[in-house]
């Protein structure tokens, strides 16, 4: 039978982490993946008594993993492999935790995830962490802060560290941040966490977007890719009759927006975790706002725009911010009415009306 690895090859550093992890005994395992969780499924195939939870923060790769295993993994394996997308790993204690990190990943997110993995371990449980830098020192230093003894496993394409949890952490760092910003003399508080866009401060692009928006009473707004919720919080604060639907594919972004709404005592924000669009009623919004990311050859921007078009009423307005207006100049005029693009400090604002 064709192996899961040949159907979709996992990352080398992830393979190395599982090679080391397979030398330890465990019935309950927590892992992350940069792929589809193929290594976890393969491990279960040869260890049918084990239960593995594979944690995703972002819903897009989570859906990819679910689709992959629905097609390629047996029912017996799927019954012991739990894929889930959430802001934090489940509270259940495990004997083994496996984490793959990237050399150029977000340092604070890596520290946060390492700490969370240690917290989920039983006393005597092991953490296995890998990195794609064979000259790594940073991850080694982080591991030594968490464990009294760290074992180094060296490979040609990766370094893997393993360590045994001997005690609960004496000091638990709080990586969550509260920051404040003003909108029309109103002080607003936002909450952010590692892994959320523009952690610890309001994004300058979001600031340009907020300043450009003028809404009236009872306006229905959808904020696509809400991040920490700064735009949603600002608009909801202006008028209690405004309804804001904030959607993002990142579980932590949705959590932060909810925390921000609670912090500002706002009851007119509804959140949705969704990387595929929105489940909100089609054609029910007056305004769609977005601050699309620049990577993925504008595929995400196109997805945001298509989501906006489905959500807006005929005549509803799209308003987004970008540093790269050329693509929008080419893409929007054939699909939207009254397209207008103008500079705003280091950014450009893009507007259009749904046909």
Which role fits each region the language model picked out?
Residues 7-15, 21, 158-220:
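SAM-dependent Rossmann-like transferase core, predominantly class I methyltransferases
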Residues 87-99, 277-288:
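A short acidic, Gly/Pro-enriched loop at the edge of an enzyme's catalytic core
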Residues 111-123, 304-314:
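A short glycine-rich, Lys/Arg-flanked "PGG" loop and its adjoining helix->strand segment in the class I
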Residues 57, 109, 248-253, 300, ...:
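Short beta->alpha hinge that forms the Motif I/post-I loop of the SAM-binding pocket
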Residues 3-77, 204-290:
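Conserved SAM/SAH cofactor-binding pocket of Class I
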Residues 96-107, 224-231, 285-297:
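Conserved proline-anchored active-site loop of SAM-dependent methyltransferases
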Residues 141, 145-186, 196, 324-330, ...:
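Class I S-adenosyl-L-methionine
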Residues 124-132, 315-322:
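Conserved beta-strand signature within the Rossmann-like core of class I S-adenosyl-L-methionine
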């Amino acid at each position: 039978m064709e192996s899961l690895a040949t159907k979709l090859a996992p990352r080398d550093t992830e393979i190395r982490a599982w090679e080391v992890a397979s030398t330890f005994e465990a019935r309950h395992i927590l892992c992350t993946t940069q792929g589809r969780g193929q290594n976890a499924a393969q491990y279960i195939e040869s260890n049918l008594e084990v239960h593995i939870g594979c944690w995703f923060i972002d819903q897009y790769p989570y859906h990819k993993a679910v689709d992959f295993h629905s097609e390629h993994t047996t029912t017996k394996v799927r019954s012991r492999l739990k894929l889930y997308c959430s802001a934090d790993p489940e509270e259940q204690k495990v004997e083994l935790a496996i984490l793959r990190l990237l050399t150029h990943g977000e340092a604070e997110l890596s520290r946060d995830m390492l700490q969370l993995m240690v917290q989920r371990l039983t006393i005597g449980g092991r953490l296995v962490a890998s990195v794609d830098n064979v000259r790594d020192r940073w991850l080694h230093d982080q591991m030594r802060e968490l464990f009294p003894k760290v074992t180094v496993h060296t490979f040609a394409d990766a370094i893997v560290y393993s360590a045994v949890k001997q005690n609960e952490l004496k000091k638990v760092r709080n990586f969550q941040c509260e920051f404040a910003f003003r909108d029309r003399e109103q002080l607003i508080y936002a909450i952010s966490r590692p892994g959320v866009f523009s952690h610890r401060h309001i994004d300058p692009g979001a600031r340009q977007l907020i300043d450009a928006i003028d809404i009236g009473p009872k306006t229905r707004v959808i904020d696509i890719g809400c991040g920490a919720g700064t735009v949603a919080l600002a608009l909801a604060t202006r008028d209690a009759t405004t309804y804001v639907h904030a959607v993002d594919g990142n579980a932590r972004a949705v959590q932060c927006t909810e925390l921000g709404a609670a912090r500002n005592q706002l009851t007119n924000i509804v959140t949705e975790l969704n990387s595929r669009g929105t489940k909100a009623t089609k054609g029910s919004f007056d305004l769609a706002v977005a601050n699309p990311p620049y990577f993925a050859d504008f595929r995400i921007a196109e997805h945001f725009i298509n989501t906006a078009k489905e959500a807006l009423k005929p005549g509803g307005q799209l308003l987004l911010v970008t540093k790269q207006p050329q693509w929008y100049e080419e893409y929007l005029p054939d699909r939207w009415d009254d397209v207008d693009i103008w500079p705003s400090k280091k950014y450009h604002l893009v507007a259009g009306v749904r046909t």
